[in-house]
Amino acid sequence: MMGRQSGQISMLILDIEELIPENHLLRKINQMISFDFIYDLVASYYPTNGRPSVDPVSMFKMLLVGYLYGIKSERRLVQEIQLNIAYRWFCGYELGEKIPDHSTFSKTRVRKWNESNVFQQIFLEIVRCCIEQRLVDGKEMAADGSYIPAEVSRNSWIDVEVEVEQSMLSYLDDLNQELASQPGFKKPPSHTVTKKITTSTTDRECGYIHHGSKRGVGYLLETTVDCKHGIVTGVDVFPANEKESLLILRHLEQQQKLLGLSMEKVALDRGYDTGAVHRGLELLGITGYIPAIRFPNDPSKYGFSYDPQQDTFICPMGQSLVYHRLNCNKSTGKYLRCYQVQGDICKKCPSREGCFDTAGARRRILASSCYPAFYRGHLRVNTPEYLHMMRKRKIWAEGSFATMKREHNLSTIHKRGILAATEECLLSAMALNLKRMVKAVFSAVFMDEIWAENMISQPIRYLCQQVQYLTLPVPPATISRKAASHRFSLPGYLSGIETAFPLKTNT
């Protein structure tokens, strides 16, 4: 007999939470973290009288759902929450409740949260939760910057002249004080210079970049990732024409102050290979791993070697060039370290004509203002620790950018202004952190349950096979024995324990 739906209307008393699967991502997020702290963060932006507003926690959760599931349009986000029961439950709305209009997002953002650091505080609170769960330890970190294009027409690009305040001190305060104590340092008065830049009439705060294949206007996203579970611990946004090496030290220092995070090792890319960055990392108590740049005026190309114990260069004739003073490079506004030969030794040297200009009295070398730290940093290149950190940087730093751009609405910046761009980047990083937080915690809980259920009733060999099967991306039968042994070595290690201490199998 063929069945057919009657279509009869029925009354049903239903708890919406019962419809959400136990393994749903939003249910796991709701179990792990409570967002009630947002009420205290935004309390000062709401008056004590008048009509009740939309719940700020529900408002934030709705935005978070959009970034978790790659829903960039706020109009479409409202439609999805209206239809999806899991989204409704996570945002705190029952089946019969009306979802706020899409214009509520923009009105709340402009009237209440636009000039605040609410999203930054929420991001930091989530990171603190990860630290409490021991998902972040600071032992191995990776930092990098990435260009995020702005959603503007190329026809809106214009060249404008702006006045920029030029100062020769732009790193850490401790590093600036250290430079100020050296001979030859003179603090110049800050002055403004006229500079021609490319920007967009649509978004005046974005910057222009032309580096290799990257060309356009947008923003520079600077992030730091903990390599233990890939939790993003720091997010800063700048115009795309800013230089990464000038921003990284204060970016890391801010995380140490706000999170109380003790960083031990940080992996960076080649663009951060400057003496100031190497020395700044040392002052922050961080061991830096940075690929070395082969500079065209490297003294080693001309047969000079550096003695780190005496802080001197040794010329091919065996004479020492000692540190003399700091010299200011007026074209770049930075200080250089001047090393030179003492006395009139160069006048009698047979290699004088090929060593330096005959108009000079002695051989000089201009190096980075923090060359000793620069040299120490280069000694770590190609060591086993360096190669290990470079692999971690590719996985977590570059991988996090790829994931946020592909899955969490960060392929472009579609809002206007650096504050709105920062909001987008923070929400994308929060979505990534929550997913990785859930994966790390619930994977550990699941593995603990397997061990607890099988430790007594199953032999160790069979237990290890179960764990091996769960840790491999494909069943063990579909991969080679050699690949399986490299992927998971615990069964071989414990086979000797099973032989020495056999366990009886329950029958």
Question: PLM ranges: what are they?
Answer:
Residues S58, L64-L68, K72-R75:
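Glycine-rich, N-terminal phosphate-binding loop and its surrounding beta-alpha-beta segment
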Residues M2-Q5, G70-L83, Y93-T507:
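Anion-binding and metal-coordination hotspots
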Residues L14, F60-L64, S106-K107:
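Positions in alpha-helical segments
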